[in-house]
């Protein structure tokens, strides 16, 4: 959904490093540190999150900025942090409407590796639609701002929306 591309653009604009949770996932899979596979998205979310949480806490303790991106951020992410940390964290989700995905599936699929060279994996339209709907629902239930792509994908517009959400 353009998460890594957005993180890359924000890194270039803000000069903040970013952590792709996909990279963390692949470290565990390739290092045989988990039996989970690239298809185990839901389980992977809860496997990775404790590690990501500690990385985020360490960055905050060292007064360092960091962008964390990926679909492995659980909607109840706040539960892992005390107020001391929460005051320094900004979070938003990116979703794509069903209509947008159906009309632009080929483009979404072909641009999925614009930043990362990914292993060949079959992109499933219905899975993308369901994941996007679920993320949007979870975000609404947990008061997480959403950037919902509904009619066109303009990275500059998305960057501006992201900067407003994080108040920079």
Where are these regions (language model features)?
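Conserved beta-strand scaffold positions in the cores of enzyme catalytic domains, especially
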Residues: 18, 88-93, 146-148
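Conserved substrate/cofactor phosphate-moiety recognition/catalytic segment
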Residues: 8-51
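Conserved nucleotide-binding/hydrolysis micro-motifs of P-loop NTPases
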Residues: 24-26, 73-74, 96-102, 153
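Walker A/P-loop
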Residues: 4
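Glycine-rich phosphate-binding loop used to anchor ATP phosphates in small-molecule kinases
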Residues: 43-93
